Amino acid sequence: MSGEVLSQNEIDALLSAISTGEMDAEELKKEEKEKKVKVYDFKRALRFSKDQIRSLTRIHDNFARLLTTHFSAQLRTYIHISVSSVDQVPYEEFIRSIPNMTILNLFDVHPMEGRIMMEVNPTIAYTMMDRVMGGIGISHNKVDSLTEIETKIISNLFENALGNYKEAWQSIADIEPEMTEFEVNPQFVQMVSPNETVVVISLNTQIGEISGVINLCIPHIVLEPLIPKLSVHYWMQSDRNEPKPEETKSLEKRIMTAQIPVVAELGTSELTIEEFLSLEVGDCITLDKSVTDPLTVLVGDKPKFLGQAGRVNRKQAVQILDHDIRGEQDGE
């Protein structure tokens, strides 16, 4: 029998059919013993193991994080990109699944053979372009009538992001992505034969209230030389290796540009619940510091410096006077 669970009505109907002779119990047993034949679709031949798909997911999770940081900085707004699915399908099926008119970026990945296609939902592409041109991120889906300037802006946006793809693959292979073609009609692009297996990585992309999908289509021929490295065993070995100097330098560069909150604290005070509930506009709260005491400057939530309040160019400011001993004692 299959793994399906019958309802009570179905069980009653089955017992009734057996008891009345409408169904032969021996015949059911015979069918159960017979070998089941599973239909195999040669057009959907699975050429990547689950282990290899997991490795590709891990690589592109990293790529999604890098893209999030890259585009957030480029467009000066918060963007969230994440992997939603990783599938292997025939190339023809992938082409049928995307819009008739869309944004297609094709790039080589030297030294591997073949090309990778990045399909960007027009809604996402136009929202990005609007942000680059100083807008608030409004999408106008008119991909069939892209001007030469619009084409250049969109292609440059994604060409500049290819460095992140190189970085995402660093633990597996040293690749050099290079944009080679920009197209809007999928029917004009023939990377591989229709039945060739491709891996499709779908990236959910959120820009403010606008959402869409970026698809990466990677033919089997591109990944074939790397298949031995797409395994958990290889990942475990590479994780134990010492980081490469360029990886350390890249990490240091990203840390140096990270932003952390800095707060100049005037002072603190303690109130009873009764006092807190009775606070009104105009009430004064006495702090624990004298007007001549230096301010505590917090980096993150740790005291790091002592400072003096002042003004610079009509804005409030704080001048660093000394290190805060408390922060040094804590080893911060």
UniProtKB/Swiss-Prot annotation:
The topology of this chain with respect to the membrane is: Peripheral membrane protein
**Pfam family of this protein, just one?**
FliMN_C
What CDD domains does the record point to? FliM
Query: What top-level branch of life does the organism fall under?
Result: Bacteria
Q: Which UniProt keywords apply?
A: Bacterial flagellum, Cell membrane, Chemotaxis, Flagellar rotation, Membrane
Which Gene Ontology biological process is one annotated for this entry? positive chemotaxis
- Tell me which PANTHER family the record gives: FLAGELLAR MOTOR SWITCH PROTEIN FLIM (PTHR30034), YOP PROTEINS TRANSLOCATION PROTEIN Q (PTHR30034:SF6)
**Family of this protein:** Belongs to the FliM family.
This molecule's function is given as: One of the proteins that forms a switch complex that is proposed to be located at the base of the basal body. This complex interacts with chemotaxis proteins (such as CheY) in addition to contacting components of the motor that determine the direction of flagellar rotation.
This protein's name: Flagellar motor switch protein FliM
Organism from which the protein derives: Bacillus subtilis (strain 168)
The beginning of the lineage is: Bacteria, Bacillati, Bacillota, Bacilli, Bacillales
